[in-house]
């Protein structure tokens, strides 16, 4: 029976770029969403930037820009990461939007009408140097529970305790280091200690959704019980301060001038705001979709560091605002490197953008993460040697190897026609059973189990193929009898049918590769669905290279270099000092344009030059000579985009006239650091566009 699901990931804070932890969570959710869609379910998968709060306000202030400009800068980066790792959200939004303002204020008013909002005068820390009330994250001190030092003002990263900033021991301002002073201020509290909230949360945290799946994993349920019930068996939930004083970048509380919602109130509402924006764009009924009595399942993927907000505050807010409560909270751990916490200072930090920029295949990482992730709240360890071994052995050595070997025989001897000797019902039934087992593992988020089973199937296919030795039969196939030909065709057809079934099973993990297999190799006009595993293919196209092996040397470039010692002299960028400062007017004199390399050829008599024919959108072609012969083969440059100094005076050379200069980078000491790198714009740029 088809289901409707509303799926989210935790909102990234919009004061920085995505880190590898974000990408892990998005890949985990994306695999789940793709698998559910392959099963025929309707999934609305949305995300958003968490765009409010003091950190954004203060960072923008430091940079001399508005908070909105800061948020927009990071929002503009998001597609590069998401597209790069084949993460396909239906919609990406922001909490700094009219939808989120309206929904946050509606929920607040509903809670207030239920008698769950209370105004209290509190003493709040104030930084006398900065001249502002301090948000929780800008107060540090000793945890009142476990006495760990340098903990934030709202929660302890060591023991997980949640507390009021005034409970910290020896607090200090994280902005100025000054000892904060206490000032009185009226604040608004969500009465989480109300017996109605306590009773609901005790039921919800131990309950299950209509599929029979628990709302919370066992480890998460145990943790919430610690927060819900004291040693004496009595409820111990504290009320939640949901307000902050101006100056603050956020959503104003209705009828309370100078008061704003704490970011953790409006941030999760951003899930709903993103869906509402998506529904408006697609003509869907948002209210009907999230009707508390309706069939839609609400599923959140989050990290283990934000359980408290999602397992207690969020469900209670929704429940008593008359809205749908979450059906499932999927919590994951952190990423470690070779068993240790990632650290830039130790050179074990992984930048997702660096991963893409050095040419590593996004689907290598998707596969590796799938092979390590499960439904428990466990950290995922990235081990470089294990990464290389798994990708090269599993994906290339086992999976891709099946198609590369079997398709060659079918193409060469049978013109791409597949044929099976005998009854194929058992084979189709076997694939269907295997696919259902894998589908169930993905739905249960036991990705590592799914990957193990898939590779076990690949092993069996390879073993059967090797045992049959089709290469021996193929040697004399031209003079072979019909039975031998049929036997060879059957062996290869069954191997390719198995490869197709494996591709269906891997499609949630390797969406780009599986799409190529479906469309290019087997001639399908759509991507795989789970039911395609049991449909035996009848034709195969000539095999094309599917996946490159991992070069272990790439891993040397992947990790962010360790921070330099403070005493070490600063290295010159690119081996040379920066040029003297110029004005914007000086720069404006240079007309840089996007150019397409229409043709490229060697220059007879020159050991350094290549002759480039460039289209700069002028209606004619330009001739440019460039000293890049040592770094590029002419055929590799044809069709590429590059950057041209378009208003450089033509230069008459021995070999002709050069009408501009193509930009390329190199180190000042070319002997010590050889290499020339022609600038290439991102896809989407067009010839003639000016570089500003």
Swiss-Prot record:
InterPro entries: aa-tRNA-synth_I_CS, Anticodon_Met, Met-tRNA-synth_bsu_C, Met-tRNA_ligase_1, Met-tRNA_synth, Methionyl/Leucyl_tRNA_Synth, MetRS_core, MetRS_Zn. PROSITE patterns: AA_TRNA_LIGASE_I (PS00178), TRBD (PS50886). Binds 1 zinc ion per subunit. ATP binds at residue 344. A motif ('HIGH' region) lies at residues 12-22. Its EC number is 6.1.1.10. It is found in: Cytoplasm. Its cofactor is Zn(2+). GO terms for biological process: methionyl-tRNA aminoacylation. Keywords: Aminoacyl-tRNA synthetase, ATP-binding, Cytoplasm, Ligase, Metal-binding, Nucleotide-binding, Protein biosynthesis, RNA-binding, tRNA-binding, Zinc. It catalyses: tRNA(Met) + L-methionine + ATP = L-methionyl-tRNA(Met) + AMP + diphosphate. A motif ('KMSKS' region) lies at residues 341-345. One of its GO terms (molecular function) is tRNA binding. Zn(2+) binds at residues 143, 146, 156, 159. The keyword Mitochondrion does not apply. Residues 586-692 form the tRNA-binding domain. One of its GO terms (cellular component) is cytosol. Is required not only for elongation of protein synthesis but also for the initiation of all mRNA translation through initiator tRNA(fMet) aminoacylation. Homodimer. Belongs to the class-I aminoacyl-tRNA synthetase family. MetG type 1 subfamily. This is Methionine--tRNA ligase. It comes from Bordetella pertussis (strain Tohama I / ATCC BAA-589 / NCTC 13251). The gene is metG.
């Amino acid at each position: 029976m088809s289901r409707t699901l509303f799926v989210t990931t935790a909102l990234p804070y919009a004061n920085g770029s995505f880190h590898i932890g974000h990408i892990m969570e998005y890949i985990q959710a994306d695999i789940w969403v793709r698998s559910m869609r392959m099963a025929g379910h309707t999934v609305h998968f949305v995300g958003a930037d968490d765009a409010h709060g003091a950190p954004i306000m203060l960072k923008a202030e430091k940079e001399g820009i508005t908070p909105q400009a800061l948020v927009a800068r990071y929002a503009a980066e998001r597609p590069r990461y998401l597209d790069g790792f084949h993460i396909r959200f239906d919609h990406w939004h922001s909490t700094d939007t009219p939808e989120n303002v309206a929904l946050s204020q509606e929920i607040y008013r509903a809670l207030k009408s239920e008698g769950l909002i209370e105004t209290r005068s509190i003493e709040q820390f104030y930084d006398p140097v900065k001249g502002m009330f301090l948000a929780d994250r800008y107060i540090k001190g000793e945890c009142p529970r476990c006495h760990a030092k340098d903990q934030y003002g709202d929660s302890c990263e060591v023991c997980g305790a949640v507390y009021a900033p005034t409970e910290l021991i020896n607090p200090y301002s994280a902005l100025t280091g000054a000892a904060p002073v206490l000032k009185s201020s009226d604040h608004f509290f969500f009465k989480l200690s109300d017996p109605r909230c306590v009773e609901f949360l005790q039921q919800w945290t131990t309950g299950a959704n209509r599929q029979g799946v628990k709302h919370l994993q066992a480890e998460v349920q145990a943790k919430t019980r610690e927060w819900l019930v004291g040693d004496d068996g009595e409820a111990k939930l504290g009320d939640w301060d949901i307000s902050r004083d101006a100056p603050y970048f956020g959503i104003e509380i209705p009828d309370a001038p100078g008061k704003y919602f704490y970011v953790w109130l409006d941030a999760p509402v951003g899930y709903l705001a993103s869906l509402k924006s998506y529904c408006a764009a697609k003509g869907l009924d948002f209210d009907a979709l999230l009707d508390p009595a309706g069939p839609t399942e609400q599923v959140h993927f989050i990290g283990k560091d934000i359980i408290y907000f999602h397992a207690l505050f969020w469900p209670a807010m929704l429940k008593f605002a008359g809205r749908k409560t979450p059906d499932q909270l999927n919590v994951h751990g952190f990423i470690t490197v070779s068993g240790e916490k990632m650290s830039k200072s130790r050179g074990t930090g992984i930048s997702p953008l660096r991963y893409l920029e050095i040419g590593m295949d996004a689907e290598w990482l998707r596969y590796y993460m799938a092979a390590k992730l499960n439904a428990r709240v466990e950290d995922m360890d990235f081990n470089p040697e294990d990464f290389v071994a798994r990708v090269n052995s599993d994906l290339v050595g086992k999976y891709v190897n099946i198609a590369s070997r079997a398709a060659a025989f079918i193409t060469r001897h049978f013109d791409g026609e597949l044929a099976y000797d005998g009854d194929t019902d058992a084979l189709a039934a076997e694939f269907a059973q295997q696919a259902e087992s894998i589908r169930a593992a993905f739905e249960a988020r036991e990705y590592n189990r799914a990957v193990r089973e898939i590779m076990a199937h690949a092993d069996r296919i390879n073993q059967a193929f090797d045992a049959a030795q089709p290469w021996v039969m193929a040697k004399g196939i031209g003079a072979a009898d019909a039975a031998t030909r049929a036997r060879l065709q059957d062996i290869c057809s069954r191997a390719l049918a198995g490869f197709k079934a494996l591709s269906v099973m891997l499609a949630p993990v390797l969406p780009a590769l599986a799409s190529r297999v479906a469309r290019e190799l087997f001639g399908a006009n759509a991507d795989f669905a789970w039911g395609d595993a049991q449909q035996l293919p009848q034709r195969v196209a000539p095999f094309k290279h599917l996946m490159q092996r991992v070069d272990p040397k790439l891993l040397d470039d992947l990790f962010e270099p360790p921070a330099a010692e403070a005493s070490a002299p600063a290295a010159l960028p690119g081996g040379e000092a920066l040029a003297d400062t110029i004005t914007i007017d000086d720069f404006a004199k240079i007309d840089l344009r996007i150019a397409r390399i229409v043709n490229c050829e060697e220059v007879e008599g020159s050991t350094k030059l290549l002759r480039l024919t460039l289209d700069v959108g002028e209606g004619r072609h330009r001739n440019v000579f460039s000293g890049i012969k040592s770094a590029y083969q002419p055929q590799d440059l044809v069709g590429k985009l590059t950057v041209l100094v378009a208003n450089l005076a033509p230069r008459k050379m021995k070999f002709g006239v050069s009408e501009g200069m193509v930009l390329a980078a190199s180190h000042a000491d070319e002997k010590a650091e050889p290499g020339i790198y022609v600038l290439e714009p991102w896809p989407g740029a067009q010839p003639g566009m000016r570089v500003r």
